[in-house]
Amino acid sequence: MTRLISTTDVRKSTCLAFCIAAILSGPAFADGTAAAAVAASSDSTAASAPQTQNAQNLGAVQVTGTATASEIAPTQGSTIAIQPQSIIGDLYLRENVAATGDYTDAISISPSVYSVAPNGPGLMEASEVAIRGFQDGQYNVTFDGIPWGDSNDFTHHSTSYFTNQDTGGIIVDRGPGTASTLGNATFGGTVAVDSRTPSDTFSVSPYLSFGSWDTQVQGIELNTGAIPQTGGTTAFVNVQNSSSDGYLTYAGQRRQNVFAKVVQPIGDNTTLTFVGMYNNINQYVPLGETRAQINQYGPNYGLSNNPDSQNYYRYNRDEINTYFGYVALHSAFDGWTIDNKLYTLSYNHFGWNGEDPNGETPNGTVYSPTDVPGQDMRNSYTSWGDIFRISKEVGPGEIRTGFWYDYQTNLRWQNEVDDTLNFAPNGVPASAAVDRYMTDTLKTFQPFVEYNWNITDTAWLTGGVKYADFERDINAIVNQKTGEPLDYSKDWNKLLPSLAAHWQFTSDWTAYAQWAKGFLAPNLNTFYTVNPLSSSDLKPEQTVNRQIGTTWNDDRLTLSADVYSIDFNNLISSRNIGGVTNFFNEGGAIYRGFETEGTYVLGSGFSVYGNGSLNRSTDKTTNDWVPDAPHKTAALGLIYREGPFYASLIDKFVGHTFGDTGNSQPIGGYAITNFATSYTFVHDMGEMKNIKIGMQVNNIFDNKSIDFLAGYTAEDNTPLYFTIPERSYELTLSAKFF
């Protein structure tokens, strides 16, 4: 099997230092628990806090004695929830997610989630991450409560920001939340990712992972512990380097990530938090493979090493660097609570690709009939924003208000080039080679107000309204598709009411009901026309969400279930043709389903886990299935956790989907079975503690079937596919100093 050698060059002194430190030791081991987040509570003030903040309770806790179901569960509901949610704690992230993985790999275990990682965990941007059939861009993703994403289409570049080692917990909220839930496309749910919490104890924790496809991860974590001289300051730093050839041929990736978090107490009631992250990626990216290529070259065919071909790996590469930072203030006094987060984030992507990497477009440029044609591009955006929340206990409840403001600037250009001649402009004059040159902005403003009414000690009602306002501006010298200039602006806004009720029947059993309206501005692509006012696609997506559910949680059993119904108007779908995503208004759709998940402690260290969903997502007019919306999902697993030993065997099934509209491009259901185990040595070795060795085997049964329609070729509209990555292995060594 041919692999990309250039992506695994020997690292310089920094990488070597990580390797030596990791071989001598490796990261601190701490079991995770979501118990604090899911424990029953009669404190309605705490229980009614915004659900996207609950993940902050998912800190790592050392498990002693017999572990409870909440401490073991890969995912679980919450007894303080007002909508369906799956809490993914620190234990699952540390034990079951690959060292190269990201949040999309972690949430793939959840009910109703369909995730495609064609090159292996975190080794390529996720091609598909759907929740209940909602595609990326139709649900919200936050980091420490801050919404982020690409304003072009509201999607998320999954490998370009935080790593699994930066992540402390995740909540998959399958619902719109209340009025205080801020972000884009909240109607499809919110994936709330929270960062690691600094420890009160000083430690240095190097780690090393290596596995299939010459995958290597070197990293080191630092916890300063509480510093009494500065009033109890704590800080966490993670520095990580990774490289892999990837599952797909010549689809290597190199990645560097630095993350830091500082928490500074100010007095007894106020805390300042500073977070900064930098990420750099160099990678080679295939667009998919035709059935003929799968049959001829195998299911892992991606790119080639032929410089005369448009799929030569050096012609199909990305250079991406990003940063994410914020300053947060939290203060609580005399019944008041104030939270404010001032943030900025950036994404800077330079990309190159062959004109038609799948071989249907012949070579030839303005310079030579045998030269290789291609394209180069840039997509660069920066956001500045602020999230402000204030609440006050008033009467029999709490009133909450605040706002989210975000201003994102974006530069996008693309040129036709001659790959053979070092990407020279493929046009005469050179200006004829310009496909697009555009700048645009998106302003988002979402003020809200809601009241949480404590009807009794065990029941509360939360009602409120949010005002969503989006303003797009474009100034294109060369507009995409038309090739002509465009200077245009458009504003969309709507009031979004919501109502949620929560009942606590016993200390172990709760239920909820929810109703809310959703709204999302059209994608930037609706401006890719001579006259955007005449475009039928220039309509916001709108929904009405209804759902009810219940949760049980005691020491031996966590169990939750829900049913939902969502009425969707102006559903925007997409189709990838020749590597270019084309959007269109599919009209209306109805989403309905049933979801459940649970964990039961059998005893003697053993627990059984399962989840499942029955989902129906259909077009209102034709009753055809919405593309990439599985009709069911399921998971079943056996977990062993006793003392220093952990092991799990978990199978995830994704049901039948259609890759395109009109019930076309059927993709069969499939199952992937993963095994993970680790052992933490009881005895220390000098200053080294919690010495740990872990192993993961993904896709045990080596299922390599087609799992996703990646798009179509530009020349002949031939379907392109991705397959499930082959069986892979990963070994991790870690320890903690001091």
Predicted regions located by residue number:
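Membrane-embedded beta-barrel scaffold of Gram-negative outer-membrane proteins
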Residues: 220, 328-333, 337-353, 504, ...
